[in-house]
Amino acid sequence: MSERIFIGVAWPYANSQLHLGHVAGAYLPADIFARYHRTRGDEVLMVSGSDMHGTPITIRAEQEGITAAEVAERYHRLFMASWPKLGISWDCYTSTATANHARTAQQMFLSLYEKGYIYKDTVCQPFCPHCNRFLPDRYVEGTCPHCKYEGARGDQCDNCGKPLNAAELLNFRCKNCGNPPEFRETEHFFLKLSAFEEELTHWVETKTYWRTNVLNFTLRYLKEGLKDRAITRDLDWGVPLPLPGYEGKRLYVWFEAVIGYLSASIEWAASKGQPDEWQKYWGGDTKSYYFIGKDNIPFHTIIWPAMLMGRGGLDLPYDVPSNEYLTIEAQKFSKSRNKAIWVDDVLSRYSVDTLRYLLSANMPESSDMDFSWREFVRRNNDELVATYGNLAQRVLTMVCRNFDNKVPEYGELDERSLNLIEKTSAMLFETDKALHGCNFREAIKLAMSLAQEANRYLDEKAPWKEIKVDKAAAARSLYVAMAALSGLRVAFYPFLPESSSRLSTYLGFGSEIEKDGWVLKMPVAGQEMIPPEPLFKKLEDSVVEEETARMGL
């Protein structure tokens, strides 16, 4: 039975290039999930966009002496160029700088305001006398009162993940000049989160299928009690407040950016010439998934659901499969200290599927995982090249050489051959279950295990020997190995779309795997084939030293 799936993916700040931490945290798992569901025949809408209004953008603009718009547009263009290289298959990738997004965000604000879920109040906000301005939360840094991390920001501690207010920080200082700010009164608008505490708690308690880290974090946060949060800031960059008399205020980015999931859906529908089409992905029997990093958990399991509850008429998240962090050579990714692997740079030297494979096999689903160049080389050479790639190359090459570039006639199959076909079908069934539950590491491990089993079958049958004495027996063995490869092209497709599409073409099916469905499609005897090229390339051991030296490790 087909499903309708909405996939919202975290919006990257348009203030820096994409690095592998971003990819492993949200974008790759979302793409795997989308490709899997499309192959199953499900309706899928996957959206995201560049967050153009965050304070990281204004901070970078001030550092470079240019406007925030110039910074945001520069990195938005870079993101747009990077996604195809990564194989990320968006249905709509946009930005928060569109008129459609501003309109949608303002409509959400007004809806909540008119229903009494947004109110205004006079509060004390950090003001830097030296810079002569109010400081947005990310312009304030200090020590986290909860975990004592010294690099906490005025909106959140990246170490323990807890949202913060600037006044809670210990030893706080202005990020721009380093001087301690003072607090002055200013009027702001607040989201009445406290009004949703009971409803949110009951809702979250039903999410027993959520990842343990996501569920526990959310329940722990709810038990501490929800505090109303300011949703406006004294800025000149961002979505204007849709009320007269407040021209100097903008919607706070954490409130505004999550509305992008809705505005992107509306933009997608308009681009199709069906302006109401977005509604089917936001109501009824649609399941909505939000792929994010763990620092975004409370915004997607508490704040965004509260906003949706307050507005009414829109689906709440079905699942929020947040990932933990990806470290690099046992160190946390850090853009400021150049401890990062930049997407465009690494893809200039290595194939996208090699990169996607390692990130999938080491995906930080329930705990932090490490990216190691030694592991990168080992998995590429031992698993992609020697196991999966070698299986495809020797089977397809033998078929093309000995059977006139056609899928061989296979006759009656013996028990061992039938057993491999059964195992291939079982693998597709098990990977389907794993992917449906967002267990990506388990799914790719199952696929590689089947490749290992197919290699054992091939070694037992030894068609290179059979061909010399019994061509019909060799034909049967090679045909069954091709059937296993047919299953593997499907199972690996969400993870490794480029090589899977090539393998599908070599098998005689054509490159569009999604049209075939999540089933074992048997090769057609007599089908014309083309001689294969290797799916993957071996990497030299010197890569480890070269790449660690490039990063100064």
From Swiss-Prot:
CDD domains, per database record: Anticodon_Ia_Met, MetRS_core
Positions of short motif 'HIGH' region: 12-22
Cellular localization per UniProt: Cytoplasm
EC assignment: 6.1.1.10
Residues annotated to bind ATP: 335
Highest rank taxon of the organism: Bacteria
Entry keyword Nucleotide-binding: yes
Entries under Pfam families matching the protein: Anticodon_3, tRNA-synt_1g
Keywords: Aminoacyl-tRNA synthetase, ATP-binding, Cytoplasm, Ligase, Metal-binding, Nucleotide-binding, Protein biosynthesis, Zinc
Annotated cofactor note: Binds 1 zinc ion per subunit.
HAMAP family: Met_tRNA_synth_type1 (MF_00098)
Role summary: Is required not only for elongation of protein synthesis but also for the initiation of all mRNA translation through initiator tRNA(fMet) aminoacylation.
Family membership: Belongs to the class-I aminoacyl-tRNA synthetase family. MetG type 1 subfamily.
PANTHER family per UniProt: METHIONINE--TRNA LIGASE (PTHR45765), METHIONINE--TRNA LIGASE, CYTOPLASMIC (PTHR45765:SF1)
Complex formation: Monomer.
Name recorded for this polypeptide: Methionine--tRNA ligase
Protein's organism: Dehalococcoides mccartyi (strain ATCC BAA-2266 / KCTC 15142 / 195) (Dehalococcoides ethenogenes (strain 195))
